[in-house]
Each structure stands twice: as structure tokens, then as C-alpha cells.
Amino acid sequence: MRTISIKSPSRLQAPNGAQLTTVAATVAMLLATSLSTPKAQAAESTESEELATVVVTGSRIVRRDFESSTPVVTVGKELLEQTPDFAIETKLRALPQFAASGASQFNANPATGGTGAATLNLRAIGDNRNLVLLDGRRLMPSTSNFAIDVNTIPASLIENVETLTGGASAVYGSDAISGVVNFKTRTNFSGIRFDVQHGSTFKNDMPNTDATLTLGANFAEDRGNAVFAVNWSDRGTIRQRDREFYRRAWATSYPASPVTIIQGAYNPTIGNNLPTEAAVDAYFATFGAPATAVSRTTSLGFNNDGTLFNATGAVGTNIYNFTSGVPLRQAVSTTATGGKVVSEYSFVGQELAVPVTRTSLFTKLNYKLNEYADVYLQAYNTHYDSLAESGPIQLGNFWAITVPRDAAHPVPAPLATILNTRANPNADWVLFKTTLYTGQRITEGRSDVSQIVGGVRGTLGLSDWTYDANVSSGRSQLVTTGVGGYVKNALAETLFDAPNYGANYRDSNGTCTSGVSPFGTFTPSQDCIDYMTVNPKNRTELKQHTAELNLQGGLFDLPAGDVRAAVGASWRKNTYLFRPDDALTIARSSNQDTDFSGTFVT
């Protein structure tokens, strides 16, 4: 079978100048017109080659005319190889049909995919609303929402990528609402090929190295072909502080909240036990604040000398008595007049790109049994290690610390004066604080994705009817381990609740020598940090089993061409299992999770 190309007048221009062919309704109309004149077509048959039959993504019908009711964009291997970025999802995002996805190389949040996975988001509907196929068959899902990690696809064997931009749920099922992306691999490869690439960004960081060895050979008098490929890839990282536009963004636009203040802050709005406005006015009047300039609902930050400052206002003009020496910046707020302030700290140390090391094995075998049957087998396994880093834990909102109001928990005199004006002066008060001293959250990810597909295809011997029957089995497992910065809130609460804020505290979980003072930029002793931090390990496992049978062929002829039909049946079973670490199943733990498992059959 030869590859043919029919170009429509409409083309998409790629960044490097390559033209991407689209097959649209206008082409279908022209071809339908030509089919209505069989005599003219016959007269020209001696001068033109016969068109090869192909299957266009979006229909299971084999045909010669490339008709499609919705646009199909085909990206060839030349464009994929010439695009300087190594990531497949980044190469395809050069097309307007693709939007940014939740899981990509530029996502360092382990809660949203920052573990090395890369998914596709067709038409910005969601990465689990488009179907990703390999040679027309389903791939093994890799994420909790059953999206496909395209890192598992052997890039060196990709011949082209077909993108159907219209909904295809009638043909492929409900997971093809936004369209279909079909990766087609090379056929009948014979020989040895070694590819190696190395590159970096324009700032000479985030180094990338990719090496692939491909072996292929024909056998049994060319009735069969076997291909084996091994790929190794290593990608470095970029931190957000390495880019000026990120540093500016953190300096002006991070959502304002007292939870980001590393000095700690008293939040009076939780618990419906506000101090009086008169007490707040009297305190801040000594620093030149007009009456009601600081509302009694304002969170009050703690200076290192025990005095208070307000966390609402414009930096340099309406922030009163800030003396801690920790840089403040203003964050734009649409809900507070004058804006809010937050502490400058190591958000910019967060990764912009996740470092990943990946190893992939892929094999493909085809063998022609007879004129009616070809058997095929395809299998792959991809393993990758990643290291995602995000900001320190914030003790606030749902994870806020409730501090007892008693003699065993002394507070600075200015705070005591304000707390004593509450309707219930002896009630607990609420602390918001970022635990900068516990460090950045660092998550190691280890993932394995494997799948095996086997089937038989051929002709039925009835006119031109063909069949394709296959089964597949796959498994995906992701293990993430927190190796730094994760706080078990229940243990942090234990220290803050203990007399003298946990100074010289000891129980079965460990010791705390210095205690964990809520006030100022106090850094506790290492044993206190060890007491409240954990190294959680979570396991996510997905399994998929499928069976599919498809038949297609011609029914009868009409003046405009033959009428063809396709009929098929499919069965699919998916199972999902999530087992979080015991430390994260306890109420109010940071990154809290619960066990979950389920199965669905379609």
C-alpha cells in the first residue's frame, strides 16, 4: 500500500514554515463531483495511477476519496523531527487545535500532573475529552482522569499524526467528544537506525538529551516484519526565579492572603468572635493610622519585636508599623480597597519545568498467514522518574492552626490587648502561617506504563469486505513519594496546642526542643521540624482490558460512487485504584487524600 496525499486550498502554516495539509468538506465535494462522471474518469485511468485505499481517522470505512465530514489535520514526521522541542505535546501545540493541558513539562505541581506525564488538550475542552490512539487502537491511560500520557509513545517510530478536530463519539465513544488524535507508526521498517538529539533553551538551561535505537527486519520471505526500539531521554529543569516574567508575576499578582505571611498572622474573621473596632483603632493610632483605617476584620501580622502590622493596604503608605525586615509586596486584590500584602518568600524557587528521566521499550510484529489473515502484535513499556518541587506548606483556611488562649500559651502584649476585647476573650484564636522552615515540597515520581495488543486482520472473501479483531491488556502505576516539605497538620497542631507551643515536648511521635512559636520569623529546632513533617507515599494504579471487532465493506453502487458500511463491537474494562499514605488520610493533613477504587465496563 502506498501513501498518497491530497492537498486542499486551505493550509496551516507551522512555525518553521512547513505546510500542514487539511482535508476538508471542499475536497470531499470535488471528489464527489468527479465520481459522478465515470466515463471521463475511465478515459483518464491510463494516465493516472490508481489511488490506494486508506482509512481516515474519524471513520472505520476504508475508501479511496479521502472524504471527511470534519477536518482532519495530518502532521508528518518531517515536521515532528524538525521542531526543536523534544516533547510531543509541545510540538503539537504549534497547531491551533491544541491548548495547554494540566499535565505537561511546564507543570511542577504534583497534585495536577507534575510527575513527568504529558497529555493533549484538543480544543481546550480537557485532556480526557479527546481520544488518543496508536495505529487506530486505544492506548493505556496514565492519569487519574484516564487521559493518555503521550510520553509513552515511541517518538522515533511516528510516521505521522492525524488530528480529527470534530467530535467523533459516534465512532469511537464518549471520550472522543472533542476529537481524535491518532499516532501512526512506521510500517515494514528494516535496518538499524540510531537517533540522538541534544538541546537547551535560549538561556542555555533545561538541557534535553534524547537517544533512540531502532532495529527492524523482514522474515519468512518478507511475509513478516519485526521492529524493536529502545529510547532513553533526560530533561533538566528550570526554576521560576530563572525567568524575569515569573519574578515580576510573583511580585505583583500572587493571590493576596495572610496565609502567605511567614511571620504569622492572626485571622479574626474565623469563629465569629471579632475584636472591637475601638481597640484596633486605638492601637494603630499610635502609628499614625486614622480611625477605621484598619478594620477589625483585618488580619494582623506579627513583627519580630512582638508588635502588630495590618495586612491590608498599599505597601509603603497604608501598612502601619511593619518592622520585621522581611520584604513585603502588594498583591492585587479585587475584594479589598487598597490591596493586600503578602510576604516575599521562595515561591520563585518552584520549578517551571519538571526534570524527567525516561526509558521506553517498544516492539511491533506483523505476519501474513495467508491471503485472508494477517496477525499482529504490539507491546511497549515506559518507565520514568521525575522530581517535582512546589512551594512550602501554608497553614491557613481549612488547615489553619487553632491556638488556645490561656496562660500556657502566652501572646505578645499588643495581641493580648486586642484579643481581650472579643465577646469571648478566652476563646481560641486562629493562626495563619507559611512554614518556610519546613522547606519546599519535593515529590519523587516513579511511573510504569505498559500495554500489549494482539490481533488478526484481513479480508473476508466476500466482495471487498475486511475485518480487524484485536484484544489488549495494559497497566499503569504511579508511585509518588514526598521527600521534603510535607507537613502532617495534626502533628503541627499538637505542637501549637502543647504548653509553651511545644517547647521540650515529647511523645511517641518524637521530640520538640525549641517549640514552634507562632510569632515572627522564628525557626524551630530540627527535631520540631522532623516531628511535624512526613514523607508520604501514594500509589495510583490503572488497568485496562479491551476487545474489539470491526467489519467494513461495500454494499452497492450509486452513480456518485459505491455505498459502504462499517459495523463493529467493542468491550472495554477499566479499573482504578488510589492508595494514599496513611499520613494523608488523617483529617486536616496537608495534601489530604482518601482511598478510592472503582471499575467500569463499556
Model-predicted segments: where are they?
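Non-catalytic regulatory/gating segments with a bias toward low-complexity or hydrophobic composition
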Residues: L80, L92, V161-E162, V181-F183, ...
